[in-house]
Amino acid sequence: MFTYTVIILLIAALLSAIALFIVHRMPAFKLLFQILYALVMVVLGIFLVTRIMKPINFKTERIRRENAAIERLKDIRKSQESYKNKYGKYTASFDTLLNFIQTDSFEISKLELRGEWNQDEMTQEQAIKEGILRKTIIKKSVRDSLFTPDFNINDIRYIPYTSNTQEFVMKAGEVETGSQLRVKVFEAYALYDILFNGMDPQEVINYKDQRYKITEFDGVKVGSITEANNNAGNWEK
């Protein structure tokens, strides 16, 4: 952008010099040339402003889209972790995950003290057996536990700004840690080429190169199926 700006300024300076020369040598054409000169300068000014605003506009739209994708990936992570807490594994299927959110429930234990309980002399199990503690199991829907009533669950699978035509890629698996423990893992991601579709191609390429040097990935992603990373998002790097 800097090179283009310099070129435009040089052209403007050259035109100004030519204008002064012609006005001095050909006074009869002074008014006509002033009009033409003004029009040319307006066009150059518009072009210059456009060049300056181009990366600014890209950054604004890029941040908007990327933040929307990150929020949706956080919702996927929250749902996946709840699914694993109940079933001991992650799922690679959005249909399974959405069905879990919409139809499943959590069991919540509630303890009610009904007498004097000396915890140094009696365990919780003994207190329940003796009737000193009353244990009640209640169920709460997964949806109500994780999301607000107005949240559209069905949108969770779709990459923002794709008119619900492109889904996040989601995978699940198992990896072995350095201490030889088998750990359940998952990942979900959106490639920048899809997330930034319709935006300036060169600006997209520049941003992809910039982020790849940091994350070694051409998109925004949560989790990993190649390593246990505690379901971290690569936007945190």
Question: Residue ranges of each PLM-predicted region?
Answer:
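Membrane-embedded alpha-helical segments of integral membrane proteins
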Residues: 1-24
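Low-complexity, acidic interaction segments enriched in glycine
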Residues: 84-237
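Alpha-helical transmembrane segments
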Residues: 5-9, 32-39
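Amphipathic alpha-helical segments typified by the pilin-like N-terminal helix
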Residues: 47-71
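Hydrophobic membrane-insertion alpha-helices, especially the h-region
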Residues: 14, 34-50
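N-terminal alpha-helical signal peptides/signal-anchor transmembrane segments
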Residues: 66-87
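Non-cytosolic membrane-interface motifs at loop->transmembrane helix junctions
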Residues: 2-6, 30, 62
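Membrane-interface helix-boundary motifs at transmembrane edges
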Residues: 23-34
